[in-house]
Amino acid sequence: MATKLWTLHFMRICLANLLLFISLYLLYPVLPVVMASRLGVPVSQTGGIYILFTLAMFVIGPFHAYLVDVYKRKYICMLSFGIMVAATAGYTLVQSATHLLLLCLVQGISFGMAATAGITLAIDVTNSTFRSAGNVVFSWAARLGM
């Protein structure tokens, strides 16, 4: 283990976390507009997309603990980031409100997995003497992404 906080691995994980949150929060103001204009969903019902996303993000939590114990953390993180990228790109192909809601469900699950796997990896690559500072820096990367 390195004896400093800012190792290359830690900086990469923080950058990935920053970009993850940026990609998600750039979609938030756009999705209701797309649902209303392109898919014909009433504006009053567009908030359901956020409820579904949030539920999916929280439901995956207990399963994440199992997956991280069984499989390598790095692969769980990479897979969830890959699914998140595919889901974000998939919004361009959506043709119905049902497909959009399913895509939000997939994106919520992958975001929940990516966020928690990222935290786990950040803790793994941080020296125990810098763990508190590492957690603060990692969480600030998420805050800046918002």
Model-found features: residue ranges?
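Helix-loop boundary and gating motifs at the non-cytosolic
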Residues: 6-39, 45-46
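Helix-breaking motifs and short loop linkers at transmembrane-helix boundaries and internal kinks
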Residues: 40, 72, 93-98
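Helix-to-loop junctions at the C-terminal end of transmembrane segments
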Residues: 60-72
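Structural signature of the two symmetry-related core transmembrane helices
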Residues: 75-89
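Paired small-residue
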Residues: 87, 98-106
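Glycine-rich segments within core transmembrane alpha-helices of 12-TM secondary carriers
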Residues: 136-146
